Amino acid sequence: MRRFKGAKGIVLLLIFVLVGIGFYYYLSDRIEIEQETEIDLTVVQELLLKDLDKKYPPSPKEVVKLYSELTRCFYAEEYSEEELYDMAQMSYQLFDKDLANHNPFDNYYAGLLKDIAYYKDNSYIMTAYTTSSSVDIENAKFEKDGYTCTKVYCYYTMRYATQITTITEVFVLRKDESGYWKIYGWDLVDENE
């Protein structure tokens, strides 16, 4: 092979250096453009990015927190019809198979739409929620029909015009065959009892 000597060698070396510098600037500009085009997601969109098939909530408390955040979004956030449907499907994934069998998705979704309309028509807004402590949840575990179950209390803060009230619900969760905690049912707690 012949070597380039003299002017030809210098010109080729200069071309390679310029191509390398150009490629470097091309890549660095591209990275800056990608960083600038990050999209600000809404609370609903961030929630819908969760893939429960790959990363299911690990504890009863986390299941109720996710369900409650979805519920808060139903009554307090802006979303499209498609996002509403996707949130409903996500909350339905948290249901135990027995609850899902007694309340098919179409019935659940129709009831949810009515509830949302009622809350919006009457200007109710869910502003916050808190759940039982992990220790209380651990102490509430019990066995039923061969399943491990537990109770989780959730306290919802609701605003109606200038009034603020707290609603307490008790959730019963059951560990399924895959080891996932699923919502078996829930009920309002009568504060007078």
Which residues fall in each region the model found?
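Core segments of small alpha/beta cavity-forming domains
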Residues: 43-123
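Phosphate-binding glycine-rich loops and adjacent basic patches that engage nucleotide phosphates
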Residues: 23-34, 48-57, 133-135, 169
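Surface-exposed, charged secondary-structure patches
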Residues: 112-160
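Short beta-strand edge/turn micro-motifs at domain boundaries
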Residues: 2, 30-42, 163-193
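Short low-complexity stretches enriched in small and charged residues
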Residues: 20-26, 47, 89, 103-110, ...
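Amphipathic, hydrophobic N-terminal targeting peptides for secretion and organelle import
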Residues: 1-45
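Short, charged low-complexity linear motifs
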Residues: 10, 89-94, 167-168
